[in-house]
């Protein structure tokens, strides 16, 4: 019973050695090493600023920065926040003034409309 197990272990070891030797041969080629370095440098390179403001499909896929910002809508810049307006001591009096101004402005417009309608009605009666 010990012999089949030893045979399996030896076959596994030989296959591991064979696979590791293949991967070492592939990694040792100078072309693949330079290609890997180039890919890694592109991966860790910061995104270049692109000032194109067009949102068409072609411009959205122009570069990685445009795709993230325009295509996906992801923006890592700090959001501008509005400063809170200074509140006055008498907020109720300020709101009363604005309401009274609104009421004053609306009333004359209604009167003008009524007078225009009355003139039009009298003109139609005379023409017939």
From Swiss-Prot:
GO molecular function annotation: RNA binding; RNA-binding transcription regulator activity
Region span, Core: 67-77
Region (Cysteine-rich), start-end ranges: 50-66
Keyword Transcription regulation: yes
Localization terms from the record: Host nucleus, Host nucleolus
UniProt KW keywords: Activator, Host nucleus, Host-virus interaction, RNA-binding, Transcription, Transcription regulation
Residue span of region Disordered: 1-34, 79-128
Composition bias, Acidic residues: 25-34
Motif annotated as Nuclear localization signal, and RNA-binding (TAR), chain positions: 78-82
GO biological process assignments: positive regulation of viral transcription
Top-level taxon in the UniProt lineage: Viruses
InterPro entries: IV_Tat (IPR001831), Tat_dom_sf (IPR036963)
This protein's GO CC annotations: host cell nucleolus
Biased composition (Basic and acidic residues): 1-19
The protein's assembly and partners: Interacts with host CCNT1. Associates with the P-TEFb complex composed at least of Tat, P-TEFb (CDK9 and CCNT1), TAR RNA, RNA Pol II. Interacts with CCNT2; the resulting complex is unable to bind to TAR RNA.
The family this protein is said to belong to: Belongs to the lentiviruses Tat family.
Function text: Transcriptional activator that increases RNA Pol II processivity, thereby increasing the level of full-length viral transcripts. Recognizes a hairpin structure at the 5'-LTR of the nascent viral mRNAs referred to as the transactivation responsive RNA element (TAR) and recruits the cyclin T1-CDK9 complex (P-TEFb complex) that will in turn hyperphosphorylate the RNA polymerase II to allow efficient elongation. The CDK9 component of P-TEFb and other Tat-activated kinases hyperphosphorylate the C-terminus of RNA Pol II that becomes stabilized and much more processive. Extracellular circulating Tat can be endocytosed by surrounding uninfected cells via the binding to several surface receptors. Endosomal low pH allows Tat to cross the endosome membrane to enter the cytosol and eventually further translocate into the nucleus, thereby inducing severe cell dysfunctions ranging from cell activation to cell death. Through.
Name of this protein: Protein Tat
Upper taxonomic lineage: Viruses, Riboviria, Pararnavirae, Artverviricota, Revtraviricetes
Gene: tat
């Amino acid at each position: 019973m010990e012999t089949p197990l030893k045979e399996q272990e030896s076959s596994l070891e030989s296959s591991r050695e064979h696979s590791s030797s293949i991967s070492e041969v592939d990694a040792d080629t100078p072309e693949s090493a330079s290609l890997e370095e180039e890919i890694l440098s592109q991966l860790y390179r910061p995104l270049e600023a692109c000032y194109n403001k067009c949102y068409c499909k072609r411009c959205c896929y122009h570069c990685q920065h445009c795709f993230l910002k325009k295509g996906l809508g992801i923006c890592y810049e700090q959001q501008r926040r509005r400063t809170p307006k200074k509140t006055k001591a008498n907020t109720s009096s300020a709101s009363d003034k604005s309401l009274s101004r609104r009421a004053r402005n609306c009333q004359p417009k209604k009167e003008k409309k009524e007078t225009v309608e009355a003139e039009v009605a009298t003109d139609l009666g005379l023409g017939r």
